[in-house]
């Protein structure tokens, strides 16, 4: 699937279109060729998208894990927001009757949710702030498995990267707002993004077609091996004005810890030239935005792409391997 975009990868880019009948992919090397898939991009007004893949036009510190005593739970419950049931953390504001509500919910309310009294003027509860500084709070994802308790200053940073937070749809550039558990990610992709093809095996060919399309374009497909699923992403974007670049990376449909057990190699090969990148796959919890921003992936410009392309089609050899721990 494809839909070139002039607004770059941050634009809304649909990630699931029913593909027309498959086209014949570019043939890989004749000597014991690995599995191959064609990933096509189609220009405006075109509907030709091979069934092999999706093309989309167009990131804790401290604490502990000791058992929480009933007394500690009773103390932290005093900080529960009556609206969202998260914890009220400093700066702590109260209504005129002394009831607490977290700062996020307070901005949406016109009166106290407990007594219906006025929330203004803002009254600071310094005593509760001192107590909060002496208490370790559970992670907001404790109900899904996180056992850490943290100082209130460490809690927001940890929760931004907590392994137990919900997984978002990993489809890059898509407008899909789905969130769910890790176990539900593949089911979501298979049902909501059916145009993303999965190839079996640790050594495959990722063939992106129509790489000369203008604007920002993403090519996506899946690779299944070693009992896991990997997402292969090739993005073309204008990182600098007038200078388009390609970024290729592999993500694991799994946690960061699981990703450390694998390595991947991306290789452009042809015309007696070779360009190789080897790295550890990123977890889909991390996404691709940070890797692209830091060029922590296979990066090449359009001039290099044309050295390896054949009639506007670019084949990338992808090899997944396990790491000895």
From Swiss-Prot:
Zinc fingers classed as SIAH-type: ranges: 134-194
Subcellular location: Cytoplasm; Nucleus
Residues holding Zn(2+) 1: 139, 146, 158, 162
Upregulating conditions: May be induced by p53/TP53, suggesting that it may be required to modulate p53/TP53 response. The relevance of such activity in vivo is however unclear and may not exist. Induced by ATF4 in response to the unfolded protein response (UPR).
Entry domain remark: The RING-type zinc finger domain is essential for ubiquitin ligase activity.
Entry's family note: Belongs to the SINA (Seven in absentia) family.
Name under which the protein is recorded: E3 ubiquitin-protein ligase SIAH2
Source species: Mus musculus (Mouse)
Lineage of producing organism: Eukaryota, Metazoa, Chordata, Craniata, Vertebrata
